[in-house]
């Protein structure tokens, strides 16, 4: 008869994020000793690291923080939502975020090379995968700097950690700038802009949109004399959809994001938006 309880299984699953059958097998082999079972799960996980390498990691979380005018955000992935909400995975993601802040890493490769607890973070990624029994990966890293930086994390499900993260930075000061930065960060989470300014949109993309607008208007039989105005109007619509400062503000559609920031004497200087798996 097994010398462990359902509570022991639950506790070890919470510690490791491992599946129920894996936990039961480890407890059986360890004669009910939780610490020995934990070691067995880790050993089994390390042996399976090569097999996990090709697996898809579409779940996970976004973690972000702001320190001294610098916002840092990471997306950390795993295979299942069960692991994504587990304590060990969340702990590892927070450790990766702390390493990103401390190291000043500019990209994921630099972050993986950063030393944490006396070893490169890349080794901790492997160890986390071994413990959790799933492939774990740091997908991307963002860093945004400004006088005021807001980090906004959004849960798409109450049972999961944040799936959407935003960093938004402005040059400005005072409560008005801080409030505007936060409100726009929330807006970015919902409205998914691709660019900060019109000038950031690649010229070839603008040319393509202008050409499509012209050809569409001609196909609709619009008068030749009206084409320039129609094309510019449709191009404006493209900018409103894709450029942050041109977008109608989420909390007040009568204002653009640019107008909201102007009213707060704040100038947008950068943003980043992550959604897990997107």
Curated annotation (Swiss-Prot):
Transmembrane segments: none annotated. The keyword Glycoprotein does not apply. Gene3D superfamilies: 1.10.286.20, DNA helicase RuvA subunit, C-terminal domain, Elongation factor Ts, dimerisation domain. Pfam families: EF_TS (PF00889). The lineage of its organism: Bacteria, Bacillati, Actinomycetota, Actinomycetes, Micrococcales. Associates with the EF-Tu.GDP complex and induces the exchange of GDP to GTP. It remains bound to the aminoacyl-tRNA.EF-Tu.GTP complex up to the GTP hydrolysis stage on the ribosome. Keywords: Cytoplasm, Elongation factor, Protein biosynthesis. One of its GO terms (molecular function) is translation elongation factor activity. CDD domains: UBA_EF-Ts. One of its GO terms (cellular component) is cytoplasm. Coiled coil: none annotated. It comes from Renibacterium salmoninarum (strain ATCC 33209 / DSM 20767 / JCM 11484 / NBRC 15589 / NCIMB 2235). Signal peptide: none annotated. It is found in: Cytoplasm. This is Elongation factor Ts. Residues 80-83 are annotated as: Involved in Mg(2+) ion dislocation from EF-Tu. Belongs to the EF-Ts family. The keyword Protein biosynthesis applies.
């Amino acid at each position: 008869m097994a010398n462990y309880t359902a509570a022991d299984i639950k506790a070890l699953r919470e510690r490791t994020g491992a599946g129920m059958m894996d936990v039961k097998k480890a407890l059986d082999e360890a004669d009910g000793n939780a610490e020995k079972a934990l070691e067995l799960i880790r050993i089994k996980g390390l042996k399976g690291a090569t097999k996990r390498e090709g697996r898809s990691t579409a779940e996970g979380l976004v973690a972000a923080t702001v320190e001294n005018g610098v916002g840092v955000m990471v997306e950390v992935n795993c295979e299942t939502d069960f692991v994504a909400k587990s304590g060990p995975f969340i702990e590892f993601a927070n450790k990766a975020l702390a390493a990103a802040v401390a190291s000043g890493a500019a990209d994921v490769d630099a972050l993986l090379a950063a030393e944490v607890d006396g070893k490169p973070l890349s080794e901790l990624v492997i160890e986390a995968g071994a413990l959790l029994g799933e492939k774990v990966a740091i997908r991307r890293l963002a860093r945004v700097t400004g006088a005021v930086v807001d980090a906004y994390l959004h849960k798409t499900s109450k049972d999961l950690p944040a799936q959407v993260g935003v960093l938004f930075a402005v040059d400005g000061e005072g409560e008005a700038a801080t409030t505007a930065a936060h409100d726009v960060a929330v807006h970015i989470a919902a409205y998914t802009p691709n660019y900060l300014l019109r000038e950031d949109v690649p010229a070839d993309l603008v040319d393509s949109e202008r050409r499509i607008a012209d050809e569409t208007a001609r196909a609709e039989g619009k008068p030749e004399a009206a084409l320039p105005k129609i094309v510019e109007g449709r191009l404006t619509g493209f900018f409103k959809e894709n450029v942050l400062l041109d977008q109608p503000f989420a909390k007040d559609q009568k204002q653009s994001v640019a107008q909201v920031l102007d009213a707060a004497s704040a100038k947008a200087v950068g943003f980043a938006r992550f959604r897990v798996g997107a």
